[in-house]
Amino acid sequence: MPAETGNRAEESQETLPAKGVQERRSSDSALAKGDINFDDLKFDLAKDAPFDSGLISDDLKQLDGREVTLRGYILPSTLFSETNISQFVLVRDNQECCFGPGAALYDCVIVEMVEGNTTDFVTRPVTVAGKFVIDTESYRYPPDLSPNGATHMAIFRIEGMDVE
């Protein structure tokens, strides 16, 4: 029997699960099929720190050039039209954290639909299928316009074949 400390709050804190959102990476079988999620894209980058390509893990590098499916939300503020959309930003969720400054670099993916393919805006989650690309050059902030020292708007792209 555990020794009593007389402090129930202290005792109960020891048995509570850790706070925060649990990371849920794709299983090996899902990855083999190209089914990825935003947790698979995470890497260790401090908030407002400049991007360093050395932080990208070998597991993440293995996704580069592969056909994948990724589920998320179309970021509405990146659209000029609600129909026949050929380029948009796919984000992890529709919460405020992904819509403003401070969103993690790995929580958004630029989707550029391949020629002849488009999609329409919806407020529900979508699944994008296409070729995953790690692109550390195309989405850099201009040096004098980078917010809080950030260097990139995005580093991931999907060349979209289909959006469901």
Regions found by a protein language model. Name each.
Residues 1-164:
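OB-fold and OB-like single-stranded nucleic-acid-recognition modules
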